[in-house]
Amino acid sequence: MASLGAGAEPESVLFGKDGTEACESPEGRRSGRRKRTKIVPVWENKPCGSSRSLVRRIGSHLPLKPCTRACFEALPPASNLYLTDTPMVPTLADVKWLAADEDETYARVRSDTRPLKHKWRPSPLLVMQRNSSVPNLKMKEEKMFCLKKPGLSLNRSSDIQEELSILRSQIARIVAGDSASSCLGSDSIPVNVDLEASLPDYGPSYQSTTSFVISDITEEDELDVSEYSSASLVDSTISLQRQVESNMSDDDEDSLCLSKSNSFADMMGILKDIHKMKLNRDWSNRNQCLHKEEDPVNLISEVLRQKFALCDPDSVKNE
């Protein structure tokens, strides 16, 4: 274009009705020859648009064909061989999606419905297998924690000992009330009356040979008490023993450090040691802290002496 002069007019490509090209120059115009032609731009005659790339040009000359799509061949029906209509070997067409493929986002479509990760819950079978295969380390940690703190069992045993002392005082008050009522009834009855008629409420106590032991009584008092027994005191001691057993069972259930048999044996040993220490401390401080009349042991021993004072010494010796 630069070689052309400034006054030169560009040539225009003309296409006739029959499709032939014709060049119209200024000389032809001057000559007066006018043809009935139609002016068509060059780019409109191209089949691929206004600008044709190199790739399109190469592709138009090369014999390229699209890749063949994967096709799944259906197996012949196996109804002749088996009762079911399902094929013997499953194909990929039967698989909707693979649960193990987490990063295969290229294969997902909008209609794909698969469970999300945060909504997935393990089945009960998986939970059972996991609990059976994997050891439960949490229980072992709790057991070790209980072993590191033996003071918890000592505190519980001290609480049990305090409850036992409260029960002993209540037993002493009950026995004292029963003895007072029996003394009022025995004053109006003559001494010559038969023993069974004078004390009908305590008849079964003479026939029974069961003996009871109270922890705060000394060895001398135990010898005196073992010779005689009372139905009310036996019942109270039985209830006391049941309550102690229930407390011991609760402590064994709460403690996870040892098995049932070992924990029960250890707890009984701890209770025995604490009981001995408490007895020594109680007997050392008994004269300073407690009055003789308010002491449960003294009350029970005094009531027993008054209760069996009407017995004949010969019958007591024979028993």
Curated annotation (Swiss-Prot):
Topology relative to the lipid bilayer, per the entry, is: Peripheral membrane protein
- Which InterPro entries does this chain map to? Mtfr1
Where is it mostly found?
mitochondrion
Its domain of life reads Eukaryota
Query: Does Membrane count among this protein's keywords?
Result: yes
UniProt keywords (A-Z) are: Membrane, Mitochondrion, Mitochondrion outer membrane
List locations, semicolon-separated: Mitochondrion outer membrane
- What function does this protein fulfil? Mitochondrial protein required for adaptation of miochondrial dynamics to metabolic changes. Regulates mitochondrial morphology at steady state and mediates AMPK-dependent stress-induced mitochondrial fragmentation via the control of OPA1 levels.
Q: Which family does it belong to?
A: Belongs to the MTFR1 family.
Q: What is this protein called?
A: Mitochondrial fission regulator 1-like
Q: Which organism is it from?
A: Xenopus tropicalis (Western clawed frog)
